[in-house]
A protein has these predicted regions:
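Conserved alpha-helical scaffold segments that buttress catalytic/binding sites
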Residues: 1-220
């Protein structure tokens, strides 16, 4: 089994740890930290996007300078959403206000509003909206990179199995090319927001598996 850059992911370096027993939100940070302490790189399958904050909290203990590539229809920069500061709509506000990442680059955004634009300016977020997207303009990363892929970053034609459909999104080829263009160390990743109840003939599941393969090829 190979990624498109011919990296084999049938490797003893890759081990499926199965499902974790999460009783409390912060168990995510603890379990991530335990694996990082053993020298592992971690690829997490969500779950909604709220999981990314505790995962990055754990990574920040190991990586003092961390870049994040977020592929998403939404900025997820709300200070609070429906009274919850740890909502799926808030993880990157928590990450950036805590200084856990040097740089946050968002690709695929097509739901920007005034509040999140203000948050993006506050945290110096590099947003690449779909309305004027040119993948060639996405700058190179200089620090260890964490990739967070929200499946609703894709156009619903490619990924119907998400909770929040946002037309006008990324194609599968655009995201593959974006991943293949990365030339810095990828130290971790997540894929989030897959909703099997809204999928059609497992289209989104197959796409998520393809993206996992391509990202794993960058991690080993």
């Amino acid at each position: 089994m190979y990624a498109e850059d011919l990296t084999s992911i049938e490797s003893p370096l890759i081990e499926d740890k199965g499902d974790f027993d999460i009783a409390d939100y912060w168990d995510i940070e603890r379990i991530t930290q335990e694996h990082l302490d053993r020298g592992a790189k971690i690829f997490t399958l969500g779950g909604d996007h709220s999981i990314t904050y505790p995962i990055i909290k754990a990574h920040s203990q190991k990586y003092s300078k961390l870049d994040i590539l977020q592929i998403d229809a939404h900025c997820d920069l709300y200070d609070s959403f429906e009274g919850d500061k740890h909502s799926h709509a808030c993880p990157f506000a928590r990450i950036m206000e805590s200084g856990l990442a040097v740089r946050l680059v968002q690709v695929g955004i097509r739901t920007l509003n005034t509040h999140q634009a203000e948050q993006a300016e506050r945290f110096n977020v590099d947003i690449h909206q779909m309305k004027d997207l040119e993948l060639s303009r996405i700058p190179k990363f200089e620090n260890p990179l964490y990739i967070s892929l929200d499946m609703d970053g894709f156009d619903p034609a490619f990924a119907p199995g998400v909770s929040h459909h946002e037309p006008g999104g990324l194609s599968s080829r655009e995201v593959i090319n974006l991943i293949q263009g990365i030339d810095t160390e990828v130290i971790g990743a997540d894929i989030v927001e897959y909703n099997p109840n809204r999928d059609f003939q497992n289209m989104t599941a197959y796409l998520a598996a393809k993206m996992m393969k391509e990202i794993l090829g960058k991690m080993i």
